[in-house]
Amino acid sequence: MPSFDIVSEIDEVALRHAVENANRELSTRFDFRGVEASIAQNGLAVTLKTESDFQVRQLEELFTKACLKQNISAAGADKPEELEHSGKTFSLTLTFRQGIDQPVAKQIVKLIKESKIKVQASIQGDQVRVNGKKRDDLQAVMALLRESKIETPLQFNNFRD
């Protein structure tokens, strides 16, 4: 019986490349000349630091573009409501999540069941397994999830026929 897994994973190497590319572009940007600005990575957390809150937002946009070039969705990152302010620096810490948390997994299963596609979806830890009799049904589920308004970036892997 064909099946596949729905997961949400961030490749740390690709994230590091995105940070390095954003830092490289930061060093050439005219609006950041003479300003202390940096993008640093610690595991799945990325910290953006600069001297004003407006520049932090610009830095966030710059980093988001670098992430998209590496096929990482920055929308899946946890971002605090307010910027951290200490001394003369403002900082923003983006924390990327690994795996699908329980409420999102339940939302995915509910969405699949409401679509009336003849497949079974089950939550297995931090991923969702989808089983069906036909490959076409599984591909319909993939298309449905790509078009859905789920905040978490999803990947499909372990496709078995």
From Swiss-Prot:
Q: Which Pfam families match?
A: DUF520
Q: Which domain of life is it from?
A: Bacteria
Q: What's in the keyword line of the UniProt record? A: Nucleotide-binding
What InterPro entries does this protein's entry cite? DUF520, UPF0234-like_C, UPF0234_N, YajQ-like_sf
Any one Gene Ontology MF annotation carried by this entry is:
nucleotide binding
Q: Which GO terms describe its cellular component?
A: cytosol
TM helices/strands, residue ranges: none
- CDD domains named in the record: YajQ_like
Q: What does this protein do?
A: Nucleotide-binding protein.
PANTHER family noted in UniProt? UPF0234 PROTEIN YAJQ (PTHR30476:SF0)
Q: Give the family, as the similarity comment puts it.
A: Belongs to the YajQ family.
Q: What is this protein called?
A: Nucleotide-binding protein ABO_0048
Q: Which organism is it from?
A: Alcanivorax borkumensis (strain ATCC 700651 / DSM 11573 / NCIMB 13689 / SK2)
